[in-house]
Amino acid sequence: MATKQTRSRANLPKHPLLEMLDVRSAEVEIFAYSVKIVCGKQAETNCCCVAGARPGVYATEVNIQNLNLVPALVVKLVLPLINSGAVVAREPNVADPFALPGRAIEEAVRLPPLGATMDDCCRIAELLLGAPPSGDTGLTIAILTIVSLVELSVSAVYTANPLSGDGISIDVEYIPSRRLGLRGRD
């Protein structure tokens, strides 16, 4: 007896991200979140081209919660634009997560129903450098891409203070989900 065929795994585009999420059909929805990361210290400089940010100390903390009653498989990719003070993706250069050495792509994390996790500057540095940093680190600006088969709640907490230590700025942003397309228009 014939059954209606749906797009199978054989018809999926080949991509390591789809394998990590264990995507089995082109009909599945994939939710993606793009979070700006600003971490470390931007020192005063006499150079004409200060990369990324004004002098100061910056930190980012990203909260991820699974507001579903089923477990959520979550994959995270870190795309460094400035890595510990070195500009690595100023045009014409680009950050390609699948060409980066080390652990820029984290293995899938399973969040239990209503469970949560976080990524902070220490975790981002560990993913980019292969180990947690010791001491002050230079400015790192990156994009943390979070991908899941279920919609998540994602927020980012940004703090900054001037090098003088006078005052502090804190900002919280809620990151909207976007649908990740598996292929172009049919």
Q: At which residue positions do the language-model features occur?
A:
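Gly/Pro-rich, tryptophan- and cysteine-flecked surface segments typical
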Residues: A2-D186
